[in-house]
Each structure stands twice: as C-alpha cells, then as structure tokens.
A protein has these predicted regions:
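Phosphate-binding site of ATP-dependent enzymes
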Residues: 2-50, 99, 103-118, 126
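ATP-dependent carboxylate/phosphate-activation module, predominantly the ATP-grasp catalytic core
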Residues: 28-83, 122-151
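A long amphipathic alpha-helix within ATP-dependent nucleotide-binding catalytic cores
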Residues: 7-16, 50-113, 152-153, 158-168
Length: 169
C-alpha cells in the first residue's frame, strides 16, 4: 500500500522526530505599517496533531515557562515578519493575524530544553489567537484556565463534557 500511495501523491517527505515537551505559538498582528507581537499561545494537541485546548494565562507566565531562547526568537521573528510582509504594507488593507507554531523538546543526550522555532506558520486567526484575545479581554493576569474546541454530536454529549470539565476544574 505504501508504494502505491507514494506514486499517487508523487513525493515523500521525511522530518526528524522530536521528543516534544510542549506546543506553543508566538502570535503577531501584521498591520498596514507594523508587525506587533500580541502574545503567546500555549496549547495541547491530540495524538493526531489536532488542536485540543489552549491554556489561558498571562503572557508573562507563559514566557517564564519557556526557555530563554524564546525572547531572542520573538525579536527575530518580528524582524523577519516585517521584512517578509514589507511589500504588502502601506496598502489600504492589513495582512492580519500570523501565528508561528513552535515546540519545546529535548534532544538525545541533552537535558536542556530546546526550541523548534517554526513548526508551522498560520496566516489566519488561529484558535491560539482566539484563546489569547479571550484571556486578554476577560481574565486577570492572576487567573488561568483552559480553552476547549470540542465538536459535539449532540446536546447530551456536550452536557456530559461540561460536567466532566466542571468536576476536573
């Protein structure tokens, strides 16, 4: 089956396997003239890589939980995004939200937590942006929570999930 699938798709791509600790993203807004850092998204994915939930917490708390290399990455990414989107700036429209998905991981033989600086770039309003904006508008810096996106087949399933989450939190 594998060879037939490769022939049908026309190519194969291989990537290194990472011993992932945590998924997170740096979130930016590309406006008409500037690139603004709007915050972090700390999130969990399920086994298939689908977004499961976002951690609602202050940017400072998220940044404190990440390796110090992230502060350098934030400055570098803002500069790179500014250069990348420069031809689109100073127009009558804005590019909008950009989320750079990253991860912390451990490499073989190294106990230090490392950062993969760009797993994926999303040129859209991601669930991470929604969670970040929800936190910024509704919670205090001392509060924390989780932001779930869960497809529910029916009201009973949704009510059961609500009961489960209420009991857990």
């Amino acid at each position: 089956h594998g060879a037939a699938t490769i022939r049908k798709m026309g190519s194969i791509m291989a990537e290194p396997w990472y011993d992932k600790e945590q998924d997170f993203a740096m979130l930016f807004y590309v406006g008409r003239e500037t690139v603004e850092f709007i915050g972090y998204s700390l999130f969990d994915n399920d086994d298939s890589g689908t977004y499961r939930c976002g951690k609602l917490m202050a940017n400072e708390r998220i940044e404190a939980s990440l390796p110090s290399a992230c502060a350098i990455a934030k400055k570098t990414l803002r500069k790179i995004l500014g250069e990348m989107f420069a031809p689109l700036m100073n127009k009558t429209w804005e590019v909008g939200y950009v989320g750079i998905d990253m991860m912390t991981f451990r490499s073989a033989g190294n106990t230090e937590l490392m950062v993969h600086p760009c797993v994926e770039m999303n040129l859209r309003c991601t669930m991470g942006v929604v969670a970040r904006l929800y936190f910024d508008r509704n919670l205090t810096t001392e509060q924390t929570g989780e932001f779930y996106i869960t497809p529910a087949a029916d009201y009973a399933t949704l009510a059961q999930l609500d009961s489960q989450l209420t009991a857990e939190h």
